[in-house]
Design a protein with these regions (language model features):
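N-terminal accessory targeting/assembly segments
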Residues: 1-88, 93, 97
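A generic structural motif
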Residues: 13, 37-39, 49, 106, ...
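Residues that form or immediately flank small-molecule/cofactor binding pockets and catalytic motifs
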Residues: 13, 49, 94, 116, ...
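Glycine-rich, histidine-containing beta strand-loop boundary motifs that form or position
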Residues: 20, 56, 93, 101, ...
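Active-site phosphate-binding and catalytic loops of NTP-dependent enzymes
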Residues: 38-42, 77-81, 95-102, 119-125, ...
Length: 465
């Protein structure tokens, strides 16, 4: 039911208060019509009897307590969706800002989405190729998964996001699209994202939503919801496999904290609202696959850990909800290694069911386990070398140290190279081939005969040239 109200009871910052209104719903969309003919959009953030509080996205400057006309639309924030969204740049509310004209919608969807019946969910299988060895081999991204990237301020997570957008694909060649939402970014970062996508030719399969640092915080809270609404339309209406990249979730959570404080809510840990967990879950749980649909929604939320603290509420709660994490290492980043993925704390909890024979290659699981095991031993050898010096290490530990350096420089630090899964797995075996066969205790004899020995032969042949 549409309601109209003349005048405002109070104006407080970005909040306006209406008295004497009935039938208003929480989260309802409001339109405020000013004397000069302009219209501002707001959202009902509190209802108390016949009083409601509206947060105005564009701010309250110029509003009048007497003559302002407020229209309560009777529905929540909606998003216009259409196949024409692909290749377009939108603001945080889903409105075009690329100068290419309006989008003619084929449907309007609630940005809050609809809850997915757990019974109708399909268990995620099949992987999404990123072209990044440390992810594809050791923390494989599975369709329908939510796999966050834990980064730190000043690290190269923006470059990594661009590389994933440029290289991401699905192995079976089915329709693939990317929804990229940037929240609270500076103008130069927004320009970097846009120019990077356009220069590499990826823009035609990308829907881009930009919420800048000087945009309203309430818009920042809507942005990931608008992005996921677009993704759900592309996936479940158009049967596309959709990858959603949300950066930076820390900006989103800080906007939520500021918004909660403005409403006078009791703060929780580090000032964040007590409902931070359920709010993040309402976003992350929109990933998945539904029975009867050929599409999927996969999420990569990117967040910068305040003070590089993985126990901070934002990464801590994100880790509870999602299915693994990719952790970027500041020490690696300082040495110029890119991408600076710290493989030992990184994991993908769903990769075991989406790799191996029929998905990637039969040796993938074994190779991944062996690389993890050997690199963990490298850390032990490094710790010992820091005490007694590398020259005093045993021969086996020296071999491990050499393997560790090669693994970091060649396997992890691949730069902007796009590697196929085959190239990644072959490189993994070539690195393991620098170690003696009896050191590979996670591999069976048949796998070693098929992959380790040919890799060792290739290395010997290359060294003899």
């Amino acid at each position: 039911m549409i309601l109209e109200h003349i005048g405002l009871s109070q104006i407080n910052g970005r909040l306006v208060v209406l008295d004497g209104v009935k039938g208003v719903q929480y989260d309802e969309r409001a339109e405020l019509h000013l004397d000069d003919g302009s219209t501002r959009v707001g959202r009902v953030v509190r209802v108390d009897g016949d009083r409601c509080v509206i947060q105005v996205f564009e701010g309250t400057r110029g509003l009048s307590l007497v003559n302002n006309r407020t229209v309560l639309t009777g529905h929540p924030m909606m998003m216009d969706v259409s196949p024409e969204l692909l290749g377009r740049v939108l603001d945080g509310l889903g409105r075009p800002i690329d100068g290419l004209g309006d989008i003619y919608p084929v449907a309007r969807r609630d940005v809050n989405g609809a809850p997915i019946n757990p019974v109708s969910r399909v268990y995620p299988r099949n992987y999404i190729h990123t072209g990044i060895s440390s992810i594809d081999c050791l923390a494989t991204l599975i369709r329908g998964q939510k796999l966050p990237i834990f980064s730190g301020s000043g690290m190269k997570h923006n470059e990594l996001a661009v590389q994933i957008v440029r290289q991401a694909s699905v192995a079976d060649g089915s329709d693939f699209a990317i929804v990229f939402a940037a929240m609270g970014v500076k103008n130069d970062v927004a320009s970097y994202f846009r120019e990077s996508f356009e220069s590499c030719g990826a823009m035609e399969r990308v829907v881009m939503l930009l919420n800048l640092a000087n945009d309203p915080i309430i818009e920042r809270i809507i942005t990931p919801r608008a992005a996921l609404t677009v993704a759900e339309y592309l996936a479940f209406d158009l049967n596309k496999n959709v990858l959603v990249i949300l950066t930076d979730m820390t900006s989103y959570c800080e906007a939520l904290r500021e918004f909660s404080s403005s409403k006078g809510e009791i703060p929780g840990r580090k000032g964040f609202p007590g409902y931070l967990y359920s709010d993040l879950a309402s976003l992350y749980e929109r990933a998945g696959i539904i029975k009867g649909s050929k599409g999927s929604v996969t999420q990569i939320p990117i967040l910068t850990m305040p003070g590089d603290d993985i126990t901070h509420p934002i990464p801590d709660l994100t880790g509870y909800i999602t299915e693994g994490q990719i952790v970027l290492d500041r020490g690696m980043d300082a040495t110029g290694l890119y991408p600076p993925v710290s493989v030992l704390p990184s994991l993908s909890r769903l990769m075991k069911d989406g790799i191996g024979a029929g998905y990637t290659r039969e040796d993938h699981v074994t190779l991944s386990n062996q690389l993890f095991a050997c690199y963990a031993k490298v850390q032990d050898a490094k710790a010992l070398a820091s005490v007694i010096g590398e020259e005093e290490l045993s021969q086996s530990d020296k071999q491990l140290m050499a393997f560790g350096r090669a693994f970091e420089q060649e396997f992890i630090g691949q730069g902007n190279t796009d590697r196929t899964m085959e190239q990644t797995l072959d490189l993994g075996w070539e690195l393991l081939a620098t170690l003696p066969r009896n050191a590979l205790d996670r591999c069976d004899a048949a796998t070693l005969d098929k992959y380790y020995e040919p890799a060792k032969a290739r290395i010997s042949k290359a060294n003899n040239k």
